[in-house]
Amino acid sequence: MTILGIGLDLVTISEFAEQLERTGTTMLRESFTAGERRYCQSKGTDPARSYAARWAAKEAVLKAWASSRFARRPQIGDNPYPLIEVVNDAWGRPSIKLHGLAAEFLPRVRVHLSLTHDGDTAAAMVVLEDPGELADLIEGREATP
């Protein structure tokens, strides 16, 4: 088991809410999956808190992925945000589901996620863990049997 990368991101909820409310913005549609939009809208009068936490999670995943590829291009694409989805289990615990290029570039990686809100701040912490031989593949080494 190897830690491949760590990512942390903070979002100011009020500033994020302003961005979402701008006339003509396509951020929700272009950055969040339909499932994420349904979840956030179900959170009552302040969906921006949930959107901000999910945005922080997406950014934290990208930072963790980039740190795992130090001095090399991350290669996830021009708009990776809808490829990184925050999902919740039956008890509300969040986790990351990767799609498309993100899933291809991070095969077999375990993504640990923690989200929090406090006052006007949402935060996410992500740890990418290789449960086996992936670190060797990323570094270009021959995987050991």
UniProtKB/Swiss-Prot annotation:
GO terms for biological process: fatty acid biosynthetic process. It catalyses: apo-[ACP] + CoA = holo-[ACP] + adenosine 3',5'-bisphosphate + H(+). One of its GO terms (cellular component) is cytoplasm. The keyword Repeat does not apply. Coiled coil: none annotated. Its EC number is 2.7.8.7. GO terms for molecular function: holo-[acyl-carrier-protein] synthase activity; magnesium ion binding. SUPFAM superfamilies: 4'-phosphopantetheinyl transferase. Keywords: Cytoplasm, Fatty acid biosynthesis, Fatty acid metabolism, Lipid biosynthesis, Lipid metabolism, Magnesium, Metal-binding, Transferase. It is an enzyme of class 2 (transferase). It is found in: Cytoplasm. The keyword Kinase does not apply. Its cofactor is Mg(2+). Mg(2+) binds at residues 9, 59. Belongs to the P-Pant transferase superfamily. AcpS family. NCBIfam families: pantethn_trn (TIGR00556), PRK00070.3-1 (NF000831). Transfers the 4'-phosphopantetheine moiety from coenzyme A to a Ser of acyl-carrier-protein. This is Holo-[acyl-carrier-protein] synthase. It comes from Nocardia farcinica (strain IFM 10152). The lineage of its organism: Bacteria, Bacillati, Actinomycetota, Actinomycetes, Mycobacteriales.
